[in-house]
Curated annotation (Swiss-Prot):
Region Disordered, annotated ranges: 254-277
Function (record text): Not known; its elevated expression suppresses the conditional cell cycle defects associated with UBC3/CDC34 mutations.
Source organism: Saccharomyces cerevisiae (strain ATCC 204508 / S288c) (Baker's yeast)
Biological process, per Gene Ontology: protein export from nucleus; protein ubiquitination
Protein name in the entry: Ubiquitin-conjugating enzyme suppressor 1
A GO CC term assigned to this protein in UniProt: nucleus
Amino acid sequence: MAYSLTRKLLKDWKYFMRHPEKTQGLFHVRPHDSDLHLWHVVMYEPRTSLEVYLLLYIGGNDQDPYIIMKCLSPNCCFPINRTVSMTHLNYLLLKDLGLQDLLFHIWQPLFHIQATEDLQYSPSTVKFNRAWNRIIYKDFKSYFPELIGTLQPGDYSIVKSYSKNHNISNSNGGSVNEFMSSYNAQSHTFHAQDNSKNPYTNSSIGKSSMLSTLNNNNVNKRTHDYNAIDFMTKNLLACDDDSIHPVVSSKRSRTLACPDETNDNRGSEHYTKRKKI
């Protein structure tokens, strides 16, 4: 039941709010107002202070939830402002403190696999991401007042330059509330992946070839009707631990380069690649 799912998410969240040491300082989480399906998350790399702001939508029922992620900060792992299915990780939510396990798992490809000497960890990139989150998303301070700090001279100019170079319109900016309100709540139907034969259900967190999909499982399909924000079906990307690829998309989208890579085409390839469909 959806009620059981939100109750479990709330319980998990309250636990590590009471015990912040359990997060190891790697993430900060807040629900979107009173909506316990939608979560604001700041992933944090404590050695460099690099942060990535993202949204998680967790819906369905407590036995077979679906997970949709949208990164709001430029990064070298996931495309910005694109919806990515993380439903292949839904088995983590079945555990005690499952929300914490899920967040730890998402944290790893963002920071852990790449060496700290890489471009995305340079001081200028850390400065850029801090400025981006606070300038583009005005509600950032509402959800994470403890992270605000102060902007520095030049912050507005680097954010404006990056937006222009990557054709990111101001419609992506403003408050997160405005950002989310651009999607309409309506009824959708989707085919959830079948995890009944998932060999990783009881495995430890780690890099694997777990496949995720929302609509290409032809065996024992289970159809869920739900009311959710419309981004659930807009250019959805499927993701496993090794790759990202489109599920339903009218056109392909390239992952945005890191800020330091804007003018530096070195031909180096990130470990996250697209699969050709």
